[in-house]
């Protein structure tokens, strides 16, 4: 059953955890990014009548990686299933940088399909105009990584797979004048 109360709690926790952070290359609060990811996830049903866990993971997907929020707090507030999803979406910083995405994708594939939806939605929302300070090499590498995400996870959501493929095909978009 959908739980508006749990979603509102997750939104508040994400807002508190990400307070002071911005969307890279913009003046916008980081909360915009996590709500965009959640909105993408909400468009997918995948034959599941209750996407609450997916939406919670979308709202909280960067909290362990980018904030001081602890795994214990996440588990206490939202349970083991949400914690496992967020942990799978979190890159393991103890690994060499070039291994982190592959490791995360393997862990995501071991989770329920909704966790893959979150990663697909995350990259869809991230494939906007890159920050001005990014080099052409970084932009190219980001596009290659997006293709790796598509290759590993698109099967879990044809709808999000199509959206990600479209974003990859047009990345990087032209910066607005």
Where are these regions (language model features)?
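Active-site helical microenvironments for divalent-metal-assisted chemistry
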Residues: 1-177
């Amino acid at each position: 059953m959908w739980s508006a109360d749990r979603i509102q709690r997750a939104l508040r926790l994400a807002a508190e955890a990400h307070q002071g952070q911005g969307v890279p290359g913009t003046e916008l609060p980081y909360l915009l990014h996590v709500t965009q990811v959640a909105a993408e996830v909400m468009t997918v049903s995948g034959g599941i009548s209750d996407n609450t866990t997916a939406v919670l993971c979308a709202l909280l997907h960067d909290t362990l990686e980018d904030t001081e929020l602890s795994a214990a707090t996440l588990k206490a507030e939202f349970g083991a299933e949400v914690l496992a999803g967020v942990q799978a979406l979190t890159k393991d910083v103890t690994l060499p940088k070039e291994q982190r995405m592959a490791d995360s994708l393997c862990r995501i594939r071991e989770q329920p399909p909704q966790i893959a939806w979150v990663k697909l939605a995350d990259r869809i929302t991230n494939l906007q105009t890159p920050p001005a300070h990014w080099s052409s090499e970084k932009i190219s590498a980001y596009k290659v990584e997006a293709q790796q995400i598509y290759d590993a996870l698109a099967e879990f959501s044809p709808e999000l797979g199509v959206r990600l493929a479209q974003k990859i095909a047009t990345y990087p978009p032209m910066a607005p004048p």
